[in-house]
C-alpha cells in the first residue's frame, strides 16, 4: 500500500517495483490497474522512465465484444513487461466461475461458524446479521451456479496469466463486508 501525498512518486514507485521484480524473475506478467481516465497517462509515464519496456496500454475498444479475443490473445502470446488497464475495464475481467464459487462457499462456511458462536452465546444481533449475510451469499451462489450472471465468461483473470497486480487508487476495492458486532 502506497499512501503518500499527491506528487510524491507513487506511480513511479509502483512501476519501478514491477520492473525490478520482473528483472529478478519474481514475476513475469504485471498488471497495473489505474483510474480509467488515466490509462494513457500512466502508459506515458512508463515510457518516460522506461522507454525500452514493452507495455500494452488497453483502451475501451479492447473490451468491445468484437475485439475481446484479440485482446486476450495479445496478452497470452506477447511478452509484455507490463499491462495497463483502467478500473472500468478491470471490472469486466472476472475470476473464473470455479474460483468465485469456492470464495462464496468459503464465506458461507465462515458465516456458519459465526452463526453457531452467536447462537451459543445468545448474541441475537450478530446471529441476525450473519443469517442475513448468509442468505445473500446463498442467493449469489445460486445465481452463479445457474449461470444467470449475464457476464461474458470468455475473459477471466486466471486465463490471462497475470502474476502481479498493482492497483492505483485501490480504495475503490476495499468494500469487503466484515462481520462486526
For the regions a language model picked out, list residue spans one by one.
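SF2 helicase/translocase NTPase motor core
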Residues: 8-13, 17-166, 174-176, 180-181
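Conserved pre-motif I regulatory segment
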Residues: 1-3
Amino acid at each position: 500500500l502506497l499512501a503518500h501525498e499527491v506528487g510524491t512518486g507513487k506511480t513511479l514507485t509502483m512501476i519501478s517495483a514491477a520492473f525490478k521484480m520482473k528483472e529478478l524473475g519474481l514475476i513475469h506478467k504485471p498488471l497495473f490497474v489505474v483510474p480509467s481516465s488515466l490509462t494513457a497517462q500512466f502508459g506515458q509515464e512508463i515510457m518516460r522512465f522506461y522507454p525500452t519496456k514493452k507495455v500494452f496500454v488497453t483502451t475501451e475498444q479492447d473490451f468491445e465484444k468484437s475485439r475481446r479475443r484479440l485482446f486476450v490473445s495479445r496478452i497470452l502470446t506477447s511478452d509484455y513487461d507490463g499491462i495497463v488497464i483502467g478500473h472500468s475495464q478491470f471490472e469486466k475481467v472476472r475470476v473464473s466461475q470455479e474460483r468465485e464459487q469456492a470464495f462464496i462457499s468459503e464465506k458461507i462456511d465462515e458465516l456458519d461458524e459465526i452463526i453457531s458462536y452467536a447462537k451459543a452465546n445468545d448474541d441475537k444481533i450478530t446471529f441476525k446479521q450473519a443469517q442475513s449475510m448468509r442468505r445473500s451469499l446463498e442467493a449469489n451462489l445460486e445465481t452463479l451456479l445457474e449461470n444467470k450472471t449475464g457476464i461474458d465468461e470468455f475473459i477471466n483473470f486466471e486465463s490471462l496469466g497475470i502474476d502481479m497486480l498493482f492497483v492505483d487508487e485501490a480504495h475503490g476495492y476495499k468494500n469487503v463486508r466484515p462481520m462486526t458486532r
